[in-house]
């Protein structure tokens, strides 16, 4: 029922189509690395699923989108220089979400030079980091999109699963790829069975 309702939702459907169009255009311009910037650790398992979905569905016939999960903000200090100033063959997806209220920083726990952080909490700092990163991406004309989860209800995750399955299928169709099989992986299975049978 929820799936049918989503398909009837013009905003949802138009958003899927818009994202598919943009991604196919980027892939055709040789931007085939999909860097997933994850600012919400509760999405770790979901994003591993998304990575698998994208890799196994699109990676065929010498084509593909290489999904790379980047753990943020940790990777701000190790990989962001590459993202901003390295090869221009990436496009980016920001994932973030509303967090539980964290304690505010008080003046007793901070250096005077950082007084501007007083009464801010960790979520405020993280949100500022995300916004700053996106502003720099825009200035440098680096392609990106952003998903923000207001809640983590089952319904929200169901919408995300539906969105990315539909998006992946339509990208595959646009690239003239069958998204439903894994012929190369089958070769490894066959070779493994041969080795085990003959050993």
Model-derived features: where do they sit?
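Active-site phosphate/pyrophosphate-binding segments
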Residues: 1-93, 101, 181, 185-199
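Helicase-primase coupling helices
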Residues: 68-153
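Short flexible/disordered coil segments
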Residues: 9-14, 94-104, 155-166
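Short alpha-helices
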Residues: 1, 124, 128, 144-187
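Short, hydrophobic/amphipathic alpha-helical patches that form generic packing surfaces
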Residues: 18-29, 56, 81-84, 128, ...
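Glycine- and acidic
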Residues: 32-37, 64-65, 113-119, 148-150, ...
């Amino acid at each position: 029922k929820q799936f049918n309702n989503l398909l009837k939702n013009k905003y949802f459907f138009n958003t899927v189509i818009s994202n598919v169009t943009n991604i196919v255009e980027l892939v055709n311009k040789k931007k085939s690395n999909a860097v997933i910037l994850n600012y919400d650790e509760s999405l770790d398992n979901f994003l591993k699923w998304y990575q698998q979905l994208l890799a196994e569905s699109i990676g065929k016939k010498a084509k593909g989108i290489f999904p790379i999960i980047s753990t943020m903000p940790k990777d701000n200090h190790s990989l962001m220089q590459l993202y901003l100033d390295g090869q221009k063959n990436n496009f980016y997806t920001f994932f973030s979400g509303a967090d539980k209220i964290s304690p505010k920083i008080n003046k007793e726990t901070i250096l005077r030079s950082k007084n501007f952080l007083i009464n801010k909490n960790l979520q405020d700092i993280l949100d500022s980091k995300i916004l700053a990163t996106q502003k720099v991406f825009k200035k440098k004309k680096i392609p990106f999109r952003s998903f923000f989860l207001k809640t983590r209800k089952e319904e929200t995750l169901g919408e995300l699963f539906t969105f990315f399955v539909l998006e992946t299928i339509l990208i595959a169709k646009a690239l003239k790829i069958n998204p439903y099989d894994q012929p190369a992986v089958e070769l490894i299975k066959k070779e493994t069975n041969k080795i085990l049978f003959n050993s």
